[in-house]
C-alpha cells in the first residue's frame, strides 16, 4: 500500500516524492509493540523502492509488481541514530534524518555516516543529511516552554541506544540528560506542556531546538549547514504556527537562500 501510494503521488507530482522511513516508535508503541527490527526496515526499503521504480519483487512468498509505475526514482531517507541504523543508511539510503538541532551532535553523526558509506563501498557524501527539530521565533523562555517536549521525545530513542550499546560508543551530550528520566506516557507523545518533559532542562532544549530571534535562527541554521546538514525540517507543532511560518518565509528562508547562493558562487569561483 505504501509503495502504491508513493507511485501514485510520483505520477501526480512529476516524480517529486521522497520516502522518509524509520523503525516506528510511537506508532507501534501505542499498540504495545516495540519498533521493528533493522533487518525488517532494510527489507521494506528494498521492496518499496523496487515497486515504485517498476521492478518486480518477491515478498512473503508472492511476486508483486506495479506495472504502471517506474517512470521515477524514489529517494529514500532513513530516520535513525544508532550504529546499526547509520551502517544501514550508509549502505542503502539516499538520505539520513536526524531528529536534532545540535550542530556538534550532527557533526558526530555525519562522521559516523561517512565512515559507513565508505565501508559499504560508496563514496563519502553519497547520503544527504536532514536535521529535523522544532523551531520557535520569539522570547527564548517562551520557546523553551513550547519545545521542551522535543528532547523528551528524542529521549525514547536515546534510551533504546543506551540499552543496546556501551555508553562510551555514544556522545555524553546525547545520552547524559536521560539519566533523570523516570518514564514516558505515549498517550501524551509530542505534546506541548506534557509531564513527559519534566526531566528536560534548558540546556538540552536550547541545543536540540532552534530558538530565539530571527537572527538566532539564521545563525544556528548556518551552523547546522556547516556541520553537514543539507535540509532542515521544522517540526511546526508548538503553537502560533502561522506567525512562525510568516517569519520563516519573510526573513529566515530568504537569508538562508542568499547564504547558500553566496557559498555556491564562492565554490564556482575557486
Regions found by a protein language model. Name each.
Residues 77-117:
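Loop-centered beta-sheet repeat module
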Residues 12, 91-92, 227-229:
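Structural motif
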Residues 1-8:
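Glycine-rich anion/phosphate-binding loops
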Residues 34-66, 106, 111-226, 257-270:
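An alpha-helical appendage that flanks or caps ligand/catalytic pockets
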Residues 9, 48, 76, 89, ...:
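Conserved, mostly hydrophobic/aromatic
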